Amino acid sequence: MHSPVLLLIDGFNLLSRGYFATSYGKDEAQLPRNEAGYYINALRVFFPKLFQLIREHNVTHVAVAWDVKREDSHRRQAFAFYKASRGELPEALIEQYETATSLLEEIGVAQVTIPPYEADDTIGAFACRWAKEEKGHCFIYSNDRDLLQLLSKSTSQIISSKGKDLIYTEENFRNDYNISPAQWVDVKALLGDKSDNIPGCPGVGEKSALPLIQQYGTIETLYEQIEDLDPKYKRYHKKLVAGEESVIISKELATITTEIEAISSFSLNSLVLTTPADLIIDTLARCGIRVKLAPVQTELKLG
């Protein structure tokens, strides 16, 4: 019996990528629907990918993490500008989110939403608990680079690029960036994130943010030594001083919560998928979705 393997899916990241990849250049009237009249273009990406990952990585435990409503997240409650620039979602995507959650429940795949936390936090708390309890390896499936801060010897991120999946490990990260995954939030604090409306430090870009953290380690150490800044960074001195408050807030926003009480007491047994394969296939087929399954494993039971 091999070691247990946990798969954590960033639900809306996968669903929305599936939606936009298959709806480009089309209006909603052109999108495929099933016999019941429900949109299924994103679902036809979501479910096959879910079960492909389960097959390929010998997954024994799986959870799909969903975000709370944007306005209900603890980050938005603390900072009104967080994600404030994002537009409304297409109705066809919202409908498929509702269909996805119903189907996942019907086929017995665990779903987790814990207000006021975002999916990143839920994933972070599960990954850290899994690592601490030495259960086995954890794979995070998402293209969200914020999650890179969670990489460890027992946690890898699966990133899709050009139709292929890349397993990105802690070793890959250290080789690419010459910092630890935990320092990624410090880089993000300086860079900001336009998609999430995280400000960062105006005037400090990719060419300087990473080298600054490589040299100073954290933004806290950087600001402790701001008046003795290395001469090669002197041109950023005024910008860093002026942007200090923004940088501190940005780090708070970029830091994933890894301690959530509800997850600390969560039964890991509930993440084991025990639904018979034929029932899963038939349930999804009735909705117009085809999937390929490996035999469902039921023998691994954890606390």
From Swiss-Prot:
CDD domains in the record: H3TH_53EXO (cd09898), PIN_53EXO (cd09859)
Enzyme Commission number(s) from the entry:
3.1.11.-
Cite a single GO BP annotation.
DNA replication, Okazaki fragment processing
List the SMART domains hit by this protein, alphabetically: 53EXOc, HhH2
Q: Would I find NAD among this entry's keywords?
A: no
A Pfam family (short name) is: 5_3_exonuc
Q: Name the Gene3D superfamilies for this protein.
A: 5' to 3' exonuclease, C-terminal subdomain, 5'-nuclease
Alphabetically ordered keywords of this record: DNA-binding, Exonuclease, Hydrolase, Nuclease
Q: Which residues form the 5'-3' exonuclease domain?
A: 179-262
Q: Which InterPro entries match?
A: 5-3_exonucl_a-hlix_arch_N, 5-3_exonuclease, 5-3_exonuclease_C_sf, DNA_polI_H3TH, FEN, HhH2, PIN-like_dom_sf
One GO term in the molecular function aspect is: 5'-flap endonuclease activity
Q: What does the function comment of this entry state?
A: 5'-3' exonuclease acting preferentially on double-stranded DNA.
Q: What is this protein called?
A: 5'-3' exonuclease
Q: Source species, please?
A: Halalkalibacterium halodurans (strain ATCC BAA-125 / DSM 18197 / FERM 7344 / JCM 9153 / C-125)
Q: What is the lineage of its organism?
A: Bacteria, Bacillati, Bacillota, Bacilli, Bacillales
